[in-house]
């Protein structure tokens, strides 16, 4: 409740006593879950301000190194995250499983929190492969988070051994909008997880829309994975994709080859660069896959 002074020291100017409380997100595990964490995760801004004014440290962490900022971002509470950062919260603090506030913001899908953290110096590049913000956003279908991360220099082709590229993750989770945004931004259409390409994974799932999308961006339908299988070899026999692959076995049209070559020359952030070309609108729309 707002105004409640749990754990406040009775001494004037004294530091608050930090009790051990049960973290509701950790089951029966007991951790140093503080009222500050509780206010942050529930978005109780007034309570958060009161606790900070009473002397609660904004960088107090649980046994798992979870900070109030982690919790505010996990639930997408922008105002709480802003207050914590303005009082010195560590923007790149990591939990014991390597999660940063930025990773948690991508879990919640809050572009506002992502932008706030990046503006305060959050790094879009994870220190380990275990908690990549851009992969998490791709997995959950948060296009806006991907846009913000890419705009701040995140590697949109970041290849993690156990996950693959963001495009591969988006395709595996059938996040069409994210896959399209990544392709429009200039990712490599054939980079996936090891020798398993994005086209392999969508063929395996018999996703017609994603197969069309990847082929439209030049996916190699003849590439073989570690088992020597082409994407068409992974398609269920009853799937209509069999016919689609057969229709695309021949060479690509000159028009398609020209589009792919032009887009490759522009590299990343292609939409912005192509839009500024002095070309007829119809041609620009073709280059942009619109």
Curated annotation (Swiss-Prot):
Subcellular location: Mitochondrion
Pathway stated in the Swiss-Prot or TrEMBL entry: Protein modification; protein ubiquitination
Any single Pfam family the record assigns to this protein: Ank
Annotated site residue numbers, Essential for binding to CKB: 103
Major site of localization recorded for this protein: mitochondrion
Record keyword Mitochondrion present: yes
Region: Disordered, residue numbers: 1-20
Annotated ANK repeat ranges: 31-60, 64-93, 97-126, 129-158, 162-191, 194-223
GO MF term list: ubiquitin-like ligase-substrate adaptor activity
Biased composition (Basic and acidic residues): 1-11
Gene Ontology terms: biological process: intracellular signal transduction; positive regulation of protein catabolic process; proteasome-mediated ubiquitin-dependent protein catabolic process; protein ubiquitination
Keywords from the UniProt entry: Acetylation, ANK repeat, Mitochondrion, Repeat, Ubl conjugation pathway
Protein family (similarity comment): Belongs to the ankyrin SOCS box (ASB) family.
Role played: Substrate-recognition component of a cullin-5-RING E3 ubiquitin-protein ligase complex (ECS complex, also named CRL5 complex), which mediates the ubiquitination and subsequent proteasomal degradation of target proteins. The ECS(ASB9) complex catalyzes ubiquitination of creatine kinases CKB and CKMT1A.
Protein name: Ankyrin repeat and SOCS box protein 9
The organism of origin for this protein: Mus musculus (Mouse)
Gene: Asb9
């Amino acid at each position: 409740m707002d105004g409640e002074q749990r754990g406040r020291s009775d001494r004037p100017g004294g530091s608050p006593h930090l009790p051990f409380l049960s973290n509701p997100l950790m089951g029966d595990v007991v951790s140093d879950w503080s009222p500050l964490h509780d206010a942050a995760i529930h978005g109780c801004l007034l309570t958060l301000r009161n606790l900070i004014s009473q002397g609660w440290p904004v960088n107090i962490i649980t046994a798992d190194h979870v900070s109030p900022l982690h919790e505010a971002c996990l639930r997408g509470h922008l105002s709480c995250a802003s207050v914590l950062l303005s009082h010195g919260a560590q923007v790149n603090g990591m939990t014991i499983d390597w999660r940063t506030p930025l990773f948690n913001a991508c879990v919640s899908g809050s572009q506002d929190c992502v932008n706030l953290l990046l503006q305060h110096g959050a790094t879009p590049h994870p220190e380990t492969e275990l908690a990549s913000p851009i992969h998490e956003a791709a997995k959950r279908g948060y296009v806006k988070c991907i846009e913000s991360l890419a705009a701040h220099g995140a590697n949109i082709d970041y290849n993690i051994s156990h996950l693959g590229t963001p495009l591969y993750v988006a395709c595996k989770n059938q996040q069409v909008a994210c896959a399209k945004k990544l392709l429009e931004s200039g990712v490599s259409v054939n980079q996936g997880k090891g020798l398993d390409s994005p086209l392999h994974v969508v063929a395996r799932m018999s996703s017609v829309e994603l197969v069309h999308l990847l082929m439209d961006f030049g996916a190699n339908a003849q590439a073989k994975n570690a088992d020597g299988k082409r994407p068409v070899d992974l398609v269920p026999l009853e799937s209509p994709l069999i016919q689609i692959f057969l229709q695309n076995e021949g060479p690509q049209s000159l028009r398609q080859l020209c589009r792919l070559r032009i887009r490759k020359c522009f590299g990343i952030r292609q939409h912005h660069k192509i839009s500024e070309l002095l070309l007829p609108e119809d041609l620009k729309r073709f280059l942009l896959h619109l």
